[in-house]
């Protein structure tokens, strides 16, 4: 009778050992998934850094460097703007003058000066970038939700849930910003 007890104990120990090995395999797979997510996130951040927001001053400086323009041509722009503001009231009231004024504000004075981006184009560029960021955040949220399924460690689980909440809130903020720009 003791022989049967030994066999059942050995069988239970064998099953317990196999379960522990399987758990270790699952933990390893989860760690590998988290590492893959980290590396892909770092790669995305590197590619998204090319879309870093720039100020108008930076854009103008880049345009000047690209075209090798001296800064004296930039000094003409405030003078031209001042001349437009000094136009007589009779011309300002004329309905034909208003479209010409708005066109002249966005037109180039010479081939050497950087042009301003019209509001429509700028808004389109901003919306395009925000939609790209939003789609990448949604993909990250999906990957985080998949990673939650395999995690057994409570600290990692809490961290992933926290990051998903941040991700969802950021997506909502970007979508509301897009709606306000439209």
Swiss-Prot record:
Belongs to the influenza viruses NEP family. Changing residue 127 to A: 90% loss of nuclear export. One of its GO terms (biological process) is exit of virus from host cell nucleus through nuclear pore. Mediates the nuclear export of encapsidated genomic RNAs (ribonucleoproteins, RNPs). Acts as an adapter between viral RNPs complexes and the nuclear export machinery of the cell. Possesses no intrinsic RNA-binding activity, but includes a C-terminal M1-binding domain. This domain is believed to allow recognition of RNPs bound to the protein M1. Keywords: Host nucleus, Host-virus interaction, Transport, Virion. It is found in: Virion; Host nucleus. GO terms for cellular component: host cell nucleus; virion component. A motif (Nuclear export signal) lies at residues 96-105, 122-132. Changing residue 132 to A: 90% loss of nuclear export. HAMAP family: INFV_NEP (MF_04067). Its main location: virion. This is Nuclear export protein. It comes from Influenza C virus (strain C/California/1978).
């Amino acid at each position: 009778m003791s022989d049967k007890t030994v066999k059942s104990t050995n069988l239970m120990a064998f099953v317990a050992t196999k379960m522990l090995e399987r758990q270790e395999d699952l933990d390893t797979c989860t760690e590998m998934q988290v590492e893959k997510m980290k590396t892909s996130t770092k790669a995305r951040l590197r590619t998204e850094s090319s879309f870093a927001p720039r100020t108008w001053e930076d854009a103008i400086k880049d345009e000047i460097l690209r075209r090798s323009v001296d800064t004296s041509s930039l000094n003409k722009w405030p003078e031209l703007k001042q001349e437009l503001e000094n136009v007589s009231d009779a011309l300002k009231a004329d309905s034909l003058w208003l479209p010409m004024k708005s066109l002249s504000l966005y037109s180039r004075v010479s081939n050497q000066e950087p042009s301003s981006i019209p509001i429509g184009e700028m808004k389109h560029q901003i919306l395009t970038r925000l939609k790209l960021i939003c789609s990448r955040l949604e993909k990250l949220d999906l990957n985080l939700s998949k990673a939650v399924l395999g995690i057994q460690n409570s600290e990692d689980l809490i961290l992933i849930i926290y990051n998903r909440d941040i991700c969802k809130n950021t997506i909502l903020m970007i979508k509301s910003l897009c709606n306000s720009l439209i």
